[in-house]
C-alpha cells in the first residue's frame, strides 16, 4: 500500500485499469478473482482442509460439465460498431452481445472467453488492451472459447476465478448466507456440487432483486407523499430517479426468474489459514456512503435490516461491490482496520449474474463504487470527481457540471465572500457574454436585466444559486450516466488508482489525503485537455480551468495555477484571482455545523468525523499553548535553512497547518514525511499531535518541508496593519507562485503574520464608512458631513493600501533579490532607489492616521485640518517632497533597467516572473508597482479638495485647502524632477545614437567643437520634429533639441541621429556656398515670425562666422508658437547669465550720496537691456530705457550737487526715445510686419524713413511759422526769454539731442544698407531695428554714466553736409495735430509731479525759439557769444562722443573714449570711434558758422538745410527698401512686385 502513491503517475496512461462491474448485471457469477475473497470468515470454516482445490482439477471438471469448444470468428464492423462488450481481466470474456449486431451475426455468444485477437494471444491481457486490439481495424478475427451453439450459457466466474494467494484456479465458491437467515451463518465445509451451488446463488439473486424492488417502490411512495405535502425541486428529482430505477429492477428480476434452468455456479473455496479481510464501501456519515468491513475473527454477521434506511438501495448495491485487485492489495496490508460503526454493517449477498442485459452496465460500476451513483456523493470524493470532470471536459460541454459545482461552492462560502463568489458565478454562467453560458430561467434573466448584479441582495443570491443548481442537475446526471457506461467499457481515466483508493479507504481514514494527491495528478490531465483547445476557445478554456481549480482547492486538493493561466488572466479582464475565493471561517464550531468536517488548525477541507467535546478541548489547549510571538529558529532544526525557501506564513511541513507551534514541540516535526500514519490524519479526539504531518493540501511539491518559525519580514513591519482578520496565500518556496493555496487560518492566535496584514488591503474599494458607525450617529449627521467622513475614510484606507503595496515591493521583490544576489548593490539602487525611505515615510503617515482614527472613538472625525498641515507642510512636506522626488525621478532608469535585464539575464527574468505571479502582487507586474508612489502623490490633493468641499466650518476648511495646496506643491516638485530625469535619460540615449562622422573641417571651421558635443551635460527644455526650409526647392526633416544654451538640429537615419552641416548658395554671391551650423548658440539668436507662413519662424544666429538665417517649419501653428516662445525665453536667460557689468567711472565725492547708487543701478539696467534687448517691443521702441527706470528720474531739476547738464541730457534722451516710440506706434504703416517674440505684445515693423519724412514736413511747417516773426520783435523776445534761462537750456537740450540721435541712427542705417548693396565693408545680417536698438542701449548707458562740471550747456543742431553721412532731423514725437513736442515731461512727471508740471507749463507758455543763420537763437540771453565760441562749447560739453552723437569736450575725450567702454571687437562703421571722428570733423566745420540772432539770411539757410535733409531721407528710403528685399531673398521668399520695382 505504501507504493500506491509513487506509482500513480506511471500508471496514468491507462496501462492496466481494472474492470469493475456489479454482479447484478452479469450473466454468471464468475467475474474476477475477488470471488475467493468475497466470502469472509462467516462463510468459511478455517479448519476445513477439504476446501482446497487445484487449478487443473477445476478446469477438468469445468470441461467435463460444459464441454467448451474453441472457435474462430471474423466480425465486420457495421454502423453500430462490433456489437459486443467485453469485461474481465486475465482472461477477458464477452460481456454482452448486441441483438442482431455484427458480433451476433458472426456467432459470438455471451460468456465466450477471448483467447486471441487477430492472432495475438490475450489470455493474460486486461479488457482495455483487448478493446484496443479489437478497435484497431474495421475487421477483427477473434478466437473464443465457449459453449457450443444451443447449449446453456456458461457462467463467467467458471473460467475467470483465480485465487489471489496461490495463483491457481479453484472451481468451488462458498455459499453465502441467505438474506433471510438473520445472522445464522451456514458454514460450507466441503465442496458443493456445481449444479446445486448454481441454483443457490441464483435463488439469492432473485430474492435480492425482489427485495430491492420492494424497497424502491416503498421509497417512491414516501417521496410522493412528501412531495404532495411540500413540493420542492429536490423531491421531484428524487421521484424521477426512483421511477427510472424501478423499471430497471423489474427487468432484471424478470430475466433472473426466466433463466432458472441455466447452468450452476461453482463456488471456489478458500485455502486454510488465510486471514481474510474484506473491505467494502465505507459507512461514512460525512459523505453518505455505506460500507462494511468484515474480519476473519467475526463470529456473526450484521443483520440485513440496515437496508431499511432511506438509502437502502445504495447500501444494497454497495454490499455487492467487487474489487479484484483491491482485495489482493488489502491482504498485503494491515489485516485489521475497522472503520465505521457496527450498526452500519449489512449482510453480503453474493449472487450470480446470468442475465445478458448490457443496458444496465452502469449498475456494475455502482456496485463497485457507489459514489458514482449521484453527484451529491461524488463531489466529496476528490479523485473520483476529478476523473468524472476529465470525462465530461473531454466528451461534452462542461458548463452545466461546472455551474453545478460552483453553485455548491457558493453554498459553502462564508458570508464575507458570498457576494464576490456570486459576481463570479454571474460572470461565468449567467451573463450574456459568459464563456460558460448555461440556460437561465426567464424569471432570473429578467431580474438580472433590471438590476446590476452587485446590487442584488444576498437572499436573492441564494435563490438564484439554488434554482440554477436544480436546473442543471438533470444534465449533470446524464453526464454521470454516460460516464458509468464508459467506465464499464474501461474507457475512463485512472481506473486502477481509484480501485486502490477505495480499498485503502476502508482500512485507513488517512487515505483522503491520498485521494487528494491522486486528484492533483488527474487535474493536470484535465489541464492538458484544456490546453489543446482552439485559439478561439482560449478564454473559455481558461474560465473552465479556473472553476475546476477553485472547486478542487475547496476540496483540499493542492492545485497550482499554471503559468499560461496567469498570463491569460491579463487578457481576461473578468477572471478573478483564485487566491481569494475560499476565505474560510475560523471558528471550528461553525465549520462543524456547515461541513461536518471540522479542522482545528486549518480550513474545513479535510473531511472527517468530528467530536464537539474534542473541539472544545482543542480550543482550550490551543489557547494555552499558543505563543505570543514566533518561536526561535534554533528550536526547529539544527541545519540552517535557505531564507528563500521559507514560507512567509511561518511553519510549513508537507502542508502542516500548525502555523504557530510551541518551540518545545517542534523537534518531532523535523522528520518530514517519516511520520506515523496516525500523525497524517485527524483523530476522533479532535486534536492533532504536535509535529504530525497534516494533509498535504497546502503543499504543491512532493518533497518534505522542514518546519520553521523563521519569518521573512523584518520585525518593524510585523504589526503594521492588524485591524481585520483575514487569510492570504503563502509566498511559495523559491518564489514559485501558489495562487490557489491559502494560509491555513490561525483560529486562536493573537498576532498576525505580515501576509495576513497584507490581506487587509487586498480589497480594491474601501469599505463603506457608514457600516463602521452606529445608526444613531448617522442620523445625527448632515449629508455633507457623511460625505466628508467617507472621503476621510477613503484617505485613510487608501494610505493603508499604499503601504501594503510598498511592503509588497520591498518584501516580494527587493528583499528577495537582495538575499539571492541576483542583482549587484548598484543595480539594486538603480531599480529600487530609496525605497526604504519612502516606505518609512508612508508607514509613519499611516500610523498617524490610525492614531487619528483611534482618537475619534465614534469613527466620526471632527477636526483633521491641523493633522493634515502637520503631515503635508513644514518638515513633513520637505521630507516627503525630496524622498518622493528621488524615488519617482528614478522611475525611468528603473523601468529601463528592468526591461533590459529581463532580456539579457534569464535568472532575473525567471525571478521577476515568479515574484509577479505571487498573489500578493494582485496581478500587477513589477513595472506597474514601481509607479504607484507617483500615483499616490496625485491622489492626495484630490482627496483633500473633496474633504474641503464637504467641510462647513470655515477655519477647518481653510486648513484643509492649505494642506491641499502643499500637496500640489509636492506634486509639482516631483513632476519637475521626473521630467528632468526623463529628459536626462533621453539625452543619454540621444548621445549614444549621435553620429558626427559627417562633419568635415572643410565645411565648417568649428568642426572640432561639434564633434565633441556632449548632450548629457546640458538640460533639455524641448524636443520635436521640425522642417528646415533651406530654399524653395530644398527642405530637410530635422529632429530638434532645445537645450539650455543651444539649439541642436539633428537628422534621423535609421537608429542614428546625424549631426551634419548644410550649405546653400546665396543670391548675392552665386559662386560661393554659405555653410550653416547644426548647433545654434542661443546667446546670439533672434527669432522672427515668417510673414507668409504662420507655421514657420526665422531663427537668426549672429555668430562669429557671420549671420545665419534658418527658416524652421513646425507641424502645427501651436507647435510653432511653443518653439518660438521657448527659444526666446531660453535665449533671454542665456544672455542674462552671460552679460557682465560695464565698468563705470565713480563720481566725485562732492556729487552726493545719490551718485554712489548710479553705477550699480546702471549695471542692473544695462543687464536687463542686454537680456532681451532685441525681443521686447518696449525695449525696441525705447520705452524701457535704463534711464527711464533709474533713480535719477526722481530728482528734480534743481537737486543740489547735480549739474544742470546731466539732467538736461537725461531728459533729452528719454524724451527722444518716447517721441520716437509714440511716432512709430501712431504713424507706422510699414509694408512688411515683424513679430517680436517674447512675453510682450508683438509690434509691427515701421518704415523709419517714411516717418522721418513726415516729421520733417511738420518741422518745416513749424519753422516757417517761427521764422515768420518780424525783425523788430527779436530783441524783445530775447529779453523776455532771459528770465527762463534754465528752462530754455533744457528745451534746447531736448531739441539738440533728438537731432543728434537721429543723425546717429541715420549713419548706422546707411552703413548697414551700404554693405547690403555692395558699398559697405563689414557684413551684418541685422534687421532695420537692430542698429537703432543697439545704439540706443549704448547711448543710454554712456549718457547716464557721464559726469559734467559745467553748468551751462549749449547743444546745437548739427547738419552733416556730406552725402555719405546724410543729416537727420529730430525724430521727436508728434501728436495728431502735427505739433512738435520740445518738452521732457515724462522724464520727471512720475517722481516729481509738482516741479515737472510747473516747468512744463512755463516752458509751453514762455519759450520762443529764434533761428539766425546756422544757430538757434535763445530768447532771453543777452550775449550770443557765450554760446558761440569753439572753446566754450568744447569746455562745457559733458558728453562722451558715442554712436553718432557729436561731442566737443576735448578734455574728456581720451578719458571716456569708446574703447574704454567696449575694448574688444573689430571697428566697424557703426562703432563709436568711427562715428565720433566723422561727427567731430563735422562739428569743427559748422561750429564757427554760428552767428548772432540778428542774421538776416538764417531763413534761407534753414530752408537749404531742410532741402538737403529731404534729399538724404529719400535716399535712405530707397536703401531701406533694398535691404528689405535682400532679407526676403535670403529667407527664400520674394517681396511684393512693388518693392521689386522700386529696388
From Swiss-Prot:
Domain PDZ: 72-151
Pfam families (UniProt xref): PDZ, PH_16, RGS-like, RhoGEF
N-acetylserine carried by residues: 2
Tissues where this protein is expressed: Expressed in brain, predominantly in neuronal cell bodies.
GO biological process, one term: regulation of blood pressure
Modified sites of kind Phosphothreonine: 736
Entry-linked CDD domains: PDZ_ARHGEF11-12-like, PH_LARG, RGS_LARG, RhoGEF
A GO molecular function held by the record: G protein-coupled receptor binding
Cellular component GO terms, alphabetical: cytoplasm; membrane
Composition-biased stretches (Basic and acidic residues): 28-45, 313-329, 582-592
Residue ranges that the Swiss-Prot or TrEMBL entry lists as coiled coil: 194-262, 981-1004
Stretch list, region Disordered: 1-62, 281-355, 574-710, 1137-1158, 1386-1405, 1441-1468
Residue(s) carrying Phosphoserine: 41, 309, 341, 637, 1288, 1327, 1377, 1457, 1540
Domain DH: 787-977
Residue ranges, compositional bias (Polar residues): 1450-1460
UniProt keyword Acetylation present: yes
Biased composition (Low complexity): 293-312, 663-676
Domain PH: 1019-1132
Domain RGSL as annotated: residue spans: 367-558
Subcellular location: Cytoplasm; Membrane
Keyword tags: Acetylation, Coiled coil, Cytoplasm, GTPase activation, Guanine-nucleotide releasing factor, Membrane, Phosphoprotein
Role description: May play a role in the regulation of RhoA GTPase by guanine nucleotide-binding alpha-12 (GNA12) and alpha-13 (GNA13). Acts as guanine nucleotide exchange factor (GEF) for RhoA GTPase and may act as GTPase-activating protein (GAP) for GNA12 and GNA13.
Oligomeric and partner information: Interacts with GNA12 and GNA13, probably through the RGS-like domain, with RHOA, PLXNB1 and PLXNB2, and through its PDZ domain with IGF1R beta subunit. Interacts with GCSAM. Found in a complex with ARHGEF11 and ARHGEF12; binding to ARHGEF11 and ARHGEF12 enhances CDC42 GEF activity of PLEKHG4B, and PLEKHG4B, in turn, inhibits ARHGEF11- and ARHGEF12-mediated RHOA activation.
Record's protein name: Rho guanine nucleotide exchange factor 12
Amino acid at each position: 500500500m505504501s507504493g500506491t502513491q509513487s506509482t500513480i503517475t506511471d500508471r496514468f496512461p491507462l496501462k492496466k485499469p481494472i474492470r469493475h462491474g456489479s454482479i447484478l448485471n452479469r450473466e454468471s457469477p464468475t467475474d474476477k478473482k475477488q470471488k475467493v475473497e468475497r466470502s469472509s470468515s462467516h462463510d468459511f470454516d478455517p479448519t476445513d482442509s477439504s476446501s482446497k482445490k487445484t487449478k487443473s482439477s477445476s478446469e477438468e471438471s469445468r470441461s467435463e460439465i460444459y464441454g467448451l469448444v474453441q472457435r474462430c470468428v471474423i466480425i465486420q464492423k457495421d454502423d453500430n460498431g462490433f456489437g459486443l462488450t467485453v469485461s474481465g481481466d486475465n482472461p477477458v470474456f464477452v460481456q454482452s452481445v448486441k441483438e442482431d449486431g455484427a458480433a451476433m451475426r458472426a456467432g459470438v455468444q455471451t460468456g465466450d472467453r477471448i483467447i486471441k485477437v487477430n492472432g495475438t494471444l490475450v489470455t493474460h491481457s486486461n479488457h482495455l488492451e483487448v478493446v484496443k486490439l479489437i478497435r484497431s481495424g474495421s475487421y477483427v478475427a477473434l478466437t473464443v472459447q465457449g459453449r457450443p451453439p444451443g447449449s446453456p450459457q456458461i457462467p463467467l466466474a467458471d473460467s475467470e476465478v483465480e485465487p489471489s494467494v496461490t495463483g491457481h484456479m479453484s472451481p468451488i465458491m462458498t455459499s453465502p448466507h441467505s438474506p433471510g437467515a438473520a445472522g445464522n451463518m451456514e458454514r460450507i465445509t466441503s465442496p458443493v456440487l456445481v449444479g446445486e451451488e448454481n441454483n443457490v446463488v441464483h435463488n439469492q439473486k432473485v430474492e435480492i432483486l425482489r427485495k430491492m424492488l420492494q424497497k424502491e417502490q416503498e421509497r417512491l411512495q414516501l417521496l410522493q407523499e412528501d412531495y404532495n405535502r411540500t413540493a420542492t425541486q429536490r423531491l421531484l428529482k428524487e421521484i424521477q430517479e426512483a421511477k427510472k430505477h424501478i423499471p430497471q429492477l423489474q427487468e432484471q428480476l424478470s430475466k433472473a426468474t426466466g433463466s432458472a434452468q441455466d447452468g450452476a455456479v461453482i463456488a471456489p473455496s478458500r485455502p486454510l489459514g488465510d486471514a481474510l479481510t474484506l473491505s467494502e464501501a465505507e459507512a461514512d456519515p460525512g459523505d453518505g456512503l455505506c460500507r462494511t468491513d468484515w474480519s476473519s475473527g467475526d463470529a456473526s454477521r450484521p443483520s440485513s435490516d440496515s437496508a431499511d434506511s432511506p438509502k437502502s438501495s445504495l447500501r444494497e448495491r454497495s454490499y455487492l461491490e467487487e474489487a479484484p485487485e483491491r482485495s489482493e492489495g488489502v491482504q498485503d496490508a494491515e489485516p485489521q482496520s475497522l472503520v465505521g460503526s457496527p450498526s452500519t454493517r449489512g449482510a453480503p449477498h453474493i449472487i450470480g449474474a446470468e442475465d445478458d442485459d448490457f443496458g444496465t452496465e452502469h449498475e456494475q460500476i455502482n456496485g463497485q463504487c457507489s459514489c458514482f451513483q449521484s453527484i451529491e456523493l461524488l463531489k466529496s470524493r476528490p479523485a473520483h470527481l476529478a476523473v468524472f470532470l476529465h470525462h465530461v471536459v473531454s466528451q461534452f460541454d462542461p458548463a452545466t457540471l461546472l455551474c453545478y459545482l460552483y453553485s455548491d461552492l457558493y453554498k459553502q462560502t462564508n458570508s464575507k465572500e458570498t457576494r464576490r463568489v456570486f459576481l463570479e458565478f454571474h460572470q461565468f454562467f449567467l451573463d450574456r457574454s459568459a464563456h460558460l453560458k448555461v440556460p437561465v430561467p426567464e424569471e432570473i434573466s429578467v431580474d438580472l436585466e433590471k438590476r446590476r448584479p452587485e446590487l442584488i441582495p444576498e437572499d436573492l443570491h441564494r435563490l438564484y444559486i439554488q434554482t440554477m443548481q436544480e436546473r442543471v442537475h438533470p444534465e449533470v446526471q446524464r453526464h454521470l450516466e454516460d460516464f458509468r457506461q464508459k467506465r464499464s467499457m474501461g474507457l475512463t481515466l485512472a481506473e486502477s488508482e481509484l480501485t486502490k483508493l477505495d480499498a485503502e479507504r476502508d482500512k485507513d481514514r488517512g487515505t483522503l489525503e491520498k485521494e487528494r494527491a491522486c486528484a492533483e495528478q488527474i487535474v493536470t490531465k484535465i489541464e492538458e485537455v484544456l490546453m489543446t483547445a482552439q485559439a478561439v476557445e482560449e478564454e473559455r478554456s481558461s474560465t473552465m480551468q479556473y472553476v475546476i481549480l477553485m472547486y478542487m482547492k475547496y476540496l483540499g486538493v493542492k492545485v497550482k495555477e499554471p503559468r499560461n493561466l496567469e498570463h491569460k488572466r491579463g487578457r481576461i479582464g473578468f477572471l478573478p484571482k483564485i487566491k481569494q475565493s475560499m476565505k474560510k471561517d475560523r471558528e471550528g464550531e461553525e465549520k462543524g455545523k456547515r461541513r461536518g468536517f471540522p479542522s482545528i488548525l486549518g480550513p474545513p477541507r479535510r473531511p472527517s468525523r468530528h467530536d464537539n467535546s474534542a473541539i472544545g478541548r482543542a480550543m482550550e489547549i490551543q489557547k494555552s499553548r499558543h505563543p505570543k510571538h514566533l518561536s526561535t529558529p534554533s528550536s526547529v532544526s539544527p541545519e540552517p535553512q535557505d531564507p528563500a525557501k521559507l514560507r512567509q506564513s511561518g511553519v510549513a511541513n508537507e502542508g502542516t497547518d500548525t502555523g504557530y507551534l510551541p518551540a518545545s514541540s517542534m523537534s518531532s516535526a523535523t522528520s518530514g514525511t517519516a511520520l506515523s500514519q496516525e500523525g497524517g490524519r485527524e483523530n476522533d479526539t479532535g486534536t492533532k499531535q504536535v509535529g504530525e504531518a497534516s494533509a498535504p493540501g497546502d503543499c504543491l511539491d512532493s518533497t518534505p518541508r522542514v518546519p520553521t518559525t523563521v519569518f521573512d519580514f523584518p520585525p518593524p513591519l510585523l504589526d503594521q496593519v492588524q485591524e481585520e482578520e483575514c487569510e492570504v496565500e503563502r509566498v511559495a518556496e523559491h518564489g514559485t507562485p501558489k495562487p490557489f493555496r491559502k494560509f491555513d487560518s490561525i483560529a486562536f492566535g493573537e498576532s498576525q503574520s505580515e501576509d495576513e496584514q497584507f490581506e487587509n488591503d487586498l480589497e480594491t474599494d474601501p469599505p463603506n464608512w457608514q457600516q463602521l458607525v452606529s445608526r444613531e450617529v448617522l442620523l445625527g449627521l448632515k449629508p455633507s458631513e457623511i460625505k466628508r467622513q467617507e472621503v476621510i475614510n477613503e484617505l485613510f484606507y487608501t494610505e493603508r493600501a499604499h503601504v501594503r503595496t510598498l511592503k509588497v515591493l520591498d518584501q516580494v521583490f527587493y528583499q528577495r533579490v537582495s538575499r539571492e544576489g541576483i542583482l549587484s548593490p548598484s543595480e539594486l539602487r538603480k531599480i529600487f532607489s530609496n525605497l526604504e525611505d519612502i516606505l518609512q515615510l508612508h508607514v509613519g503617515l499611516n500610523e498617524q492616521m490610525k492614531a487619528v482614527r483611534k482618537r475619534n472613538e465614534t469613527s466620526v472625525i471632527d477636526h483633521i485640518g491641523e493633522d493634515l498641515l502637520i503631515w503635508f507642510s513644514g518638515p513633513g512636506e520637505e521630507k516627503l517632497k525630496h524622498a518622493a522626488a528621488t524615488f519617482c525621478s528614478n522611475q525611468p532608469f528603473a523601468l529601463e533597467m528592468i526591461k533590459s535585464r529581463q532580456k539579457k539575464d534569464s535568472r532575473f527574468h525567471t525571478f521577476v516572473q515568479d515574484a509577479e505571479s505571487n498573489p500578493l502582487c494582485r496581478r500587477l507586474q513589477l513595472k506597474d508597482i514601481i509607479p504607484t508612489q507617483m500615483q499616490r502623490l496625485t491622489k492626495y490633493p484630490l482627496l483633500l479638495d473633496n474633504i474641503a468641499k464637504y467641510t462647513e466650518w470655515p477655519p477647518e476648511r481653510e486648513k484643509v485647502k492649505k494642506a491641499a495646496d502643499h500637496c500640489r506643491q509636492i506634486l509639482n516638485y516631483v513632476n519637475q524632477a521626473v521630467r528632468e530625469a526623463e529628459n536626462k535619460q533621453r539625452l543619454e540615449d540621444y548621445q549614444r545614437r549621435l553620429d558626427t562622422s559627417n562633419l568635415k573641417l572643410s565645411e565648417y571651421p568649428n568642426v572640432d567643437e561639434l564633434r565633441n558635443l556632449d548632450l548629457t551635460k546640458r538640460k533639455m527644455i524641448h524636443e520635436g520634429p521640425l522642417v528646415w526650409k533651406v530654399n524653395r526647392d530644398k527642405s530637410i526633416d530635422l529632429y530638434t533639441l532645445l537645450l539650455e544654451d543651444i539649439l541642436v538640429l539633428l537628422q534621423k537615419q535609421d537608429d542614428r541621429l546625424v549631426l551634419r552641416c548644410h550649405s546653400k548658395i546665396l543670391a548675392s554671391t552665386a559662386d560661393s556656398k554659405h555653410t550653416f551650423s547644426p548647433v545654434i548658440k542661443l546667446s546670439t539668436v533672434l527669432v522672427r515670425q515668417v510673414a507668409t507662413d504662420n507655421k514657420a519662424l526665422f531663427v537668426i544666429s549672429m555668430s562669429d562666422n557671420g549671420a545665419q538665417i534658418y527658416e524652421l517649419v513646425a507641424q502645427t501653428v501651436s507647435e510653432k508658437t511653443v518653439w518660438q516662445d521657448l527659444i526666446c525665453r531660453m535665449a533671454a536667460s542665456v544672455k542674462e547669465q552671460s552679460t557682465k557689468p560695464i565698468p563705470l567711472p565713480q563720481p566725485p565725492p562732492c556729487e552726493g550720496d545719490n551718485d554712489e547708487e548710479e553705477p550699480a543701478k546702471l549695471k542692473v539696467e544695462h543687464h536687463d537691456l542686454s537680456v532681451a534687448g532685441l525681443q521686447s517691443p518696449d525695449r525696441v521702441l525705447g520705452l524701457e530705457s535704463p534711464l527711464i527706470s533709474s533713480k535719477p528720474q526722481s530728482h528734480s531739476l534743481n537737486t543740489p550737487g547735480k549739474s544742470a547738464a546731466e539732467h538736461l541730457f537725461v531728459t533729452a534722451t528719454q524724451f527722444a526715445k518716447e517721441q520716437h516710440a509714440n511716432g512709430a506706434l501712431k504713424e507706422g504703416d510699414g509694408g512688411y510686419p515683424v513679430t517680436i517674440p517674447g512675453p510682450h505684445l508683438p509690434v509691427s515693423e515701421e518704415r523709419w524713413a517714411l516717418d522721418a519724412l513726415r516729421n520733417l514736413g511738420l518741422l518745416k511747417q513749424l519753422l516757417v511759422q517761427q521764422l515768420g516773426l518780424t525783425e523788430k520783435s527779436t530783441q524783445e523776445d530775447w529779453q523776455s526769454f532771459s528770465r527762463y534761462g534754465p528752462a530754455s537750456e533744457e528745451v534746447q537740450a531736448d531739441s539738440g539731442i533728438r537731432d543728434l540721435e537721429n543723425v546717429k541712427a541715420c549713419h548706422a542705417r546707411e552703413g548697414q544698407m551700404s554693405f547690403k548693396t555692395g558699398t559697405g565693408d563689414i557684413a551684418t545680417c541685422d534687421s532695420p531695428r537692430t542698429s537703432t536698438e543697439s545704439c540706443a542701449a549704448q547711448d543710454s548707458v554712456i549718457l547716464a554714466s557721464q559726469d559734467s562740471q559745467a553748468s551751462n550747456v549749449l547743444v546745437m543742431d548739427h547738419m552733416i553736409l556730406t552725402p555719405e553721412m546724410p543729416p537727420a532731423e529730430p525724430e521727436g514725437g508728434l501728436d495728431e495735430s502735427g505739433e512738435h513736442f520740445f518738452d521732457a515731461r515724462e522724464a520727471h512727471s512720475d517722481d516729481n509731479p509738482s516741479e515737472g508740471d510747473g516747468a512744463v507749463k512755463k516752458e509751453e507758455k514762455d519759450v520762443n525759439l529764434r533761428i539766425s543763420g546756422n544757430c538757434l537763437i535763445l530768447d532771453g540771453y543777452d550775449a550770443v557769444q557765450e554760446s558761440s565760441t569753439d572753446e566754450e562749447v568744447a569746455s562745457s560739453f559733458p558728453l562722451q562722443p558715442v554712436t553718432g552723437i557729436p561731442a566737443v569736450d576735448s578734455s574728456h575725450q581720451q578719458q571716456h573714449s569708446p574703447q574704454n567702454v567696449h575694448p574688444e571687437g573689430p571697428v566697424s562703421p557703426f562703432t563709436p570711434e568711427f562715428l565720433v571722428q566723422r561727427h567731430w570733423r563735422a562739428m569743427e566745420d559748422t561750429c564757427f558758422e554760428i552767428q548772432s540772432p540778428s542774421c538776416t539770411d538764417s531763413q534761407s539757410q534753414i530752408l537749404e538745410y531742410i532741402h538737403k535733409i529731404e534729399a538724404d531721407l529719400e535716399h535712405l528710403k530707397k536703401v531701406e527698401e533694398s535691404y528689405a528685399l535682400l532679407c526676403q531673398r535670403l529667407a527664400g521668399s520674394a517681396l511684393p512686385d512693388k518693392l521689386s520695382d522700386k529696388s
